[in-house]
Amino acid sequence: MKTTVDSNSCSEIHAMRGPIAAVHTPFDASGRIDPGVVPAYAEHLRSAGIAAVYVCGSTGESLALTTAERRSILEAWTETAAGSIRIIAHVGSNALPEAEELARHAHEVGVDAISAMNPTFGRARNVDDLVRHHARIAAAGEDRPYLVYEISAFGGVSFPAAEVIERAVSMIPGFAGLKFTSSDPLQLQLAVALAETHGLRIFFGADENLLSGLAAGCVSAIGSTYGYAAEPA
């Protein structure tokens, strides 16, 4: 199959190696988001050797935040960390227009990549429907590399990762790979092998199974526990 994967997107993604912190969204004592915490948070991660963050994903409680809150948190990260920490913005939403709006905003504030989880409501009937959903979000993000966030444990639709990759390389010009959060080793191995043939990247997302991800060939991982990293000795 002829692919339409953008080589620039892949090169930017391949520059992200090692642990990527899926960052928490800070809240104050009254339960409001607190973007003012982000500079200290970013400095802690920099001092611990973390070179990239995944903002407003499941760890960041994105689906419990308003669109305005998600925009505000992402802006705090880009204003604080752009140029010193690479930023992947999660823009997924069950409301496709909201996801598209967040993708446009992510592009405007200069993130390094965009990602979205599969919808958990109004599920796609087949792989093509699912990839068309992601293609619309990716198009709103214009030239930003795009990662599909596979996390079937959240109850969303799930198809074999290799099938998603095969469709995405021909339907999403900026497609750069997957954030794979599953405990299925066979699916992971197939996805890694296929990603390599297309010059893509699989980011392993199940922290507790990191060793199996490394054994399967992943060279980078996105997870909440990497944000707890101690300062290197």
What annotation goes with each model-predicted range?
Residues 2-157:
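Active-site beta->alpha loop and helix N-cap motifs at the rims of alpha/beta catalytic domains
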Residues 138-145, 152-233:
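Catalytic alpha/beta core domains of metabolic enzymes, predominantly
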